[in-house]
Amino acid sequence: MQMYLVSSLLVALLSTAFESSIDRAFTAANMNDWQDAASALDEAFTQDPQTFDANNLHYLRGRIAENQTEWLRAREEFNKIGADNPLHSLAVWHALRASVQLHDEASAAQFLGALPREFPAELKMRIAREAGPPLTVKIYEDLSTREARLEQAKLQNDIRSMRDLFREKKDDDVALEAARLFSPHVLTPLDQIDVAQVFAAHRQFEQALPFYEKASADPAHAAVARYETARVYFWLQDYKSAVEMYRAIAKDFQGTNWQKDAEYQIALVYWKMADYHNSETAFLDYIRKYGPAGNKEAAIRNLVDVYRVLGEYRKGVETIDRALLTPLSPVTRQVLLFTKAKILYSEDRYAAASAIFQQLRQMKLRSAAGAATAEEAAYFQALSQSKLGNQAAAEAIWRKLALDEFSYYGQRAAEKLGRTETVVTSTAACLPAENLTVAVEADLASLRHPLRSEISRSSDLVSELVFLRLWDEAAFWMERLGATRIPPRGAAGIAYLAGRYNRSIFYADRLPKTGATLPLLYPAGYGQTICDAAMAQNVDPVWLHAIIWQESRYNPNARSGAAARGLMQFIPETAQAVAASAGMSEVTLDKLYDPAISIQLGAKYWSTLLDQLNSPEMALAAYNGGPDNVEKWRSKALDPELFVADIGFTETKKYVLAVFAVRAAYASLLK
């Protein structure tokens, strides 16, 4: 009996020591202290080899060795994961990577052959980028992704395949690189147009221009090539050349849609040049000439804006009133009514303006450039009533709007009611998020299995990775395997701990908005980098978080249709200009995907815009829509109250409203 008690006590002590070593390993790994993590795991293996093996801790030991660049030890540990283990295919991939780092080509080829054919292409591509030519070629041959096809075409100098790639799709990075490599081999006018379109899609306008010009010499492609040439001049802000080209197109292609479209563009270019009288004449000529057969409704809207900039409000109202007597689409009718109300408000005709704002509130409002939102119509009706001295009526509307503390007009209404915003200091915004990390890990405890004495054959890959707290791989495979067994709350937590903040936002957006879930929906990702950049530029880091959230949802690999890249979504020419002003080295397209560089550029640009415009609304509009457009929008009315309502791009207006809402959410979390 005494011997049994001694034996039981020894087992308990060993078990306690083992668990203590494992806890130390997890803590050290979480702090990136790889040496201490490795030491703790080695102790645990000595204390209880069977339990160590049963809980897949050899896999964790291999990952630790990888971080120490101890590739031989890493491969040894991954080789201990058996074929019937749910982590086997991952272990094979890691052993393959270790073999590549060790320049052991024979072993690497063997491990590559052992990978399942359906193993994720992006992980195979990572090996290809690190491996030597024989293995690289083999990987590319077995993959059909655009990235693999491009790399294979580069290795084989396969010009035809490069052309196929950018003809299939023009707006991704593969297309741009393929077009660059193909451009010296352009053979036909169609090739020239295709290459030019790729460069233009990526805002490489100076590279696009010579290809369009060459293609325009071919009669079969002259119209499209010359029209696109004019567009390139426009984007390069060479407005004089753009007008000349559009005029030549209108003359040489009379009676066609090319003429009609060119004449509309001429009016827009004059507007962009601030040559408002010529713009007025061009829009009037266009409307008279083409009527409903042309882009009449848009021309009328633009013509009214010209009158507003010129201060010719009477002409603007008369143009609107005439148009309202004709058949119009519902959205154009709403836009014109809203514009008329803003003109009347600018003329201090508050009663007439209020009546139209009330009329708009009773409509089913649609989203469009220049259209009102329901909140906007209510806010301006209240503003009109306030100007008329009907303060009670105004405050009743503002109180309703202020119930939504996150919305832009809710915030403005609260200001009108005398409520002051709680200021969040930069220090508060820069506090470390360790408490949140601990809370999220605790929340995931139910997904982690307890220590076991033998491997469970029913376990799945993601569960094993969650137990090992390998959040990066758990987040990756959770989505690849469609791990529906993990609820959105757990999935958001795993993604957050993995630093995949865009996926944390994706899952948290499905959850009730509570104190526990809001930090997952509005993560303070890249916190220290953002705080350092904010302090260097003397800007509020909360604004930077809000801009990143709206621009990319914290996805460092985000790319927009307008060729903007990275966390803070810079287009190439803006990035180069900001980098030069900040004294940074040349920023290549690849560098725009680097979070640190994107944040550094974003903080500098945001600081510059705030200094220039002295208004967060205008600075946000400039960030999204361009500073030159902000000048056009602000010139429509002297009253700054009207600026957001006068933003001419639907996307930019939504952007400004959204960033204010997101900033309020971040501020509420930091109170």
Q: Where is each model-derived feature located?
A:
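"A position-specific structural signal for the A-helix of alpha-solenoid helical repeats
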Residues: 23, 60, 94, 126, ...
